[in-house]
């Protein structure tokens, strides 16, 4: 809802770069160090071209790629865009697992991990372990955003993120629901919630299902 920011829907854009590394340069993702400066420039331009083609706001100063499975891609992202800013969003682990389990995802290899609570818990644990490892070993510029903090104090929490992005506050941010409505179809698993007001009922919701954890 900020005029200077465009958020790209949850699309695996970085996967296209990974495929190009394998098909064009014949390297595995464990061989990123073998890529030359020229190779990186080609890959960088490839990603940016795809990213911009998926933008709604062509005048946006900042583009946010919010594909949720990009944690495992941080080494590649950091290599291509060492000055990029990472916003790591998280919430209570139990609520995260429950929410993923309750979503109606389009079937694919990644989403199959959410077919039951146990499998969802394992993929969450793996993802968080990867994050904890990468954030100490990689020189990444990041800020964390906790869902519960957002619910508790929306304006101050958003302001903290805007300051990190070097963007000023805009009153239109409060109208995020109207912005979502105007976009029409939203291709995210939680699309029905995007147009809803922020609510506290989702906090600690997992306790209603505690016996399943």
Regions of interest found by a model, annotated:
Residues 74-77, 149, 155:
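Short gly/Ser/Thr-rich phosphate-binding loop of adenylate-forming enzymes
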Residues 20-21, 27-61, 97-144, 152-213:
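PAPS-dependent sulfotransferases, especially Golgi type II membrane carbohydrate sulfotransferases
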Residues 76-102, 161:
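Conserved phosphate-donor/acceptor-positioning beta-strand/loop module used by diverse small-molecule
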Residues 1-81, 89-90:
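Phosphate-binding active sites in nucleotide-utilizing proteins
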Residues 71-74, 95-96, 128:
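Conserved coil-to-alpha-helix start sites within the AMP-binding
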Residues 68-70, 148-151:
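Short, internal active-site loops enriched in acidic
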Residues 6, 85-87, 143-145:
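Hydrophobic/aromatic beta-strand patches that form the interior of the parallel beta-sheet core
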Residues 12-14, 91-96, 149-151:
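Conserved nucleotide-binding/hydrolysis micro-motifs of P-loop NTPases
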